[in-house]
Amino acid sequence: MSIGCSVGGGVSLIELADTYGTPLLVYDLNRVEVNYRALVDNTGARVYYSIKANGNLALLRFLRSLGAGADASSPGEIYLALRAGFRPGDIMYTGSFLSNTEIEYGIRAGVTFNFDSIRAFEKALGLGYEPRLVFFRVDLGYGRGFTHGVTLAGEDSKFGMFINDAIEAYRLAKLKGAVEYGIHAMMGSNVLDADYFLKIANLLRESARVIEDKVGVKITHYDMGGGFGIPYKPGEPELDLSKLRGLRGYFPGELIIEPGRFIVGNA
């Protein structure tokens, strides 16, 4: 039987199945690298790969070798990142409604925390967390889900805190001895419109300015989480990354992005 099915540089899937047996998952690391470098080259950002997209250790090790950091949302994902060789300082830990046990795991691991609420930050302080570099996730009031009914920003969203709560969180971090500050926003999910990301960048920078003015701190790390999409249906456009070459210029400090499916979805 002949089936014209290949992957990567013409490698036959039939031959791979004959060699390794089935069921078999095959990843094209060349495609992973192309996707990774396209984001880095066009945005000027540091990539923290979102482990929730695919936590395969071989993929994680490969992305680490390219220079990526890791975005983790649970102790399990922190564990995978550490197993793959990521340094704790290159792991961003963002979770909604983290339990004491989940927070304690992150503290012991020494990862960078991105707190979703002032309550979570206060809980961590009570468990012995000592902030040095600390991120807070801010709800910009604007965000797109991958399908109708998925809310990523605004009153009904679980992601992040509104500006007044964020101001109080940064004030508390300053009081507790933090020396570096980051700000994070959930951009959306599977967005294919490049102009949308520029709008989010502007909103994030404006939120940072307000916080800096009110609290008297300097935000030096800007994290745009999620968002970068890939087409799933015939006729859907690809995300035009060339329009994002000015993205880095919106921010006076380090820009971080947290792609997942864009890196591995078509690999």
Segments (PLM) and residue ranges:
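Active-site-proximal beta-alpha loop/turn segments in soluble metabolic enzymes
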Residues: 60, 142-158, 182-197, 221-239, ...
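Structured core elements
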Residues: 69, 92, 114, 135-137, ...
